[in-house]
């Protein structure tokens, strides 16, 4: 796996958060795609698509932790004929207890892939793994993917230059945010 850039992940998740907060009615918080919390240990972003899939990204000063859950994955213990705790435990094998403790038992149970990055990427994988790594696409490795997702998911037309600025910087002014969404 290639180098994971803390600043880029934060900026791209912040960009998605800005769009999601702007377009989601505060009275309908349950419809949010992404939620950001600031914790003692760092920043946490939870992306939940409302269909049983989630991506939980924790950014500490020393680590990046990325936990994914794809409810259709063969690694989901909720869909297994027989629960296999060893599969879940193996995802976290080698992770320092101080970081492991950031997840509740229920959160750990909802894991179909887990990556941590401390300068080197660590991931326990399985043969024929289909653990939902597609969820990593929420980290948007290109502006084109971000643009396509935003316009398709939210069904909006945007000022491409302002969206690019949001993608690169992770924020827009209030005025820029109002100008971002174009009337069809």
Residue ranges: model-predicted function:
Residues 1-52, 61, 76-184:
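N-terminal domain-onset segments
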Residues 69-76:
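Short, solvent-exposed aromatic-acidic interface loops
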